[in-house]
C-alpha cells in the first residue's frame, strides 16, 4: 500500500493491537506479566502521555520481552528499559533481542541492564 507521496506502508492485520503479534508460549508467568503491562497500557498510560524516548515504547518493549523470554528475564529487561528512558538515558530504536546470549543467566538479573544500553552506545 502506498500513500500519496509514494512511500510504501505495511498494513497490520485487522484485530491486532499495539503489542507484539508474534507467537509465544502462554505460560502462567507470561500471561501474568503481559496482563499487567496491558492493564497499565489501558489505564495509567493515558495519564502519563507520550513521554517515551524509545521505539517501541517502554510498555510495548516490556510486553514483547515478557512474551519472548518469560516473566523473570522479560520483566527485568522491561524494568531496566524504563530506567534508561529518563532525560539523561538512551533514546531511539531499541528492539527486544530474539534470543538471549548465554551470559544473561537468571541468577544475575543486573546483566539485563546492558542489553539495550550497548546497542544505543554503538549508534551514537
Swiss-Prot record:
Q: Where in the cell is it found?
A: Cell inner membrane
Q: Where is the composition biased (Low complexity)?
A: 12-24
Q: How does it sit in the membrane?
A: Peripheral membrane protein
InterPro entries in the record: Membr_insert_effic_factor_YidD (IPR002696)
Q: What is its main location?
A: membrane
Which key words are in the record?
A: Cell inner membrane, Cell membrane, Membrane
Which parts of this chain are annotated as the region Disordered? Answer: 1-24
- GO annotation, cellular component aspect: plasma membrane
Q: What does this gene product do?
A: Could be involved in insertion of integral membrane proteins into the membrane.
Its family remark reads: Belongs to the UPF0161 family.
HAMAP family in the record: UPF0161_YidD
Q: What is this protein called?
A: Putative membrane protein insertion efficiency factor
Amino acid at each position: 500500500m502506498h500513500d500519496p507521496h509514494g512511500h510504501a506502508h505495511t498494513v497490520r492485520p485487522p484485530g491486532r493491537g499495539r503489542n507484539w503479534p508474534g507467537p509465544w508460549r502462554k505460560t502462567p508467568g507470561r500471561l501474568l506479566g503481559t496482563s499487567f503491562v496491558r492493564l497499565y497500557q489501558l489505564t495509567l498510560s493515558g495519564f502519563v502521555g507520550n513521554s517515551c524516548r524509545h521505539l517501541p515504547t517502554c510498555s510495548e518493549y516490556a510486553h514483547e520481552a515478557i512474551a519472548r523470554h518469560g516473566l523473570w528475564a522479560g520483566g527485568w529487561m522491561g524494568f531496566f528499559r524504563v530506567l534508561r528512558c529518563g532525560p539523561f538515558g538512551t533514546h531511539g530504536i531499541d528492539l527486544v533481542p530474539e534470543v538471549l546470549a548465554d551470559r544473561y543467566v537468571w541468577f544475575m538479573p543486573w546483566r539485563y541492564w546492558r542489553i539495550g544500553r550497548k546497542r544505543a552506545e554503538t549508534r551514537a
